[in-house]
């Protein structure tokens, strides 16, 4: 059995990302930016978003969080996403789930432009991923894969529990 040091893998990944962001800044003369939309006041979501913001800033990304009360109208959220889709200073958009019941999750996901879909949930990105084409990879599976990739083992030899 191999024990994976997740903290070490995360530190290595952060250093690599910091370098990549620095190179992107130099090459394109702009800072890549992540905008997270948080609706409501669920404590786990707030903690998760705060951690995303901290990690983004740590590697040199521009990070914005847009907060709405859980009573926000769906159209307000869709309008904001459309505005962010057109904003060249926003490289990625993430809408923190879960959403209040009156907001159609699928409609929200489909409104995010596929090239700015950080979660990889847009139907075009899901289709591309399942067909083997280049696409965004959903965060959770990627987050499971990356620490394993730092072991430099081939996946068929890895057993997880």
Question: Which residue ranges define each predicted feature?
Answer:
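Positively charged, low-complexity intrinsically disordered leader regions
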Residues: 1-26
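Short beta-strand segments enriched in small/hydrophobic residues
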Residues: 31-41
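Short, solvent-exposed amphipathic alpha-helices that sit
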Residues: 46-59
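Short beta-strand elements in bilobed, periplasmic/extracellular small-molecule ligand-binding domains
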Residues: 56-68
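Short, well-structured alpha-helical segments in soluble
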Residues: 76-87
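Anion-binding alpha/beta catalytic cores of soluble intermediary-metabolism enzymes, centered on
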Residues: 95-153
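Single conserved hydrophobic/aromatic residue that forms the stacking wall/gate
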Residues: 152-161
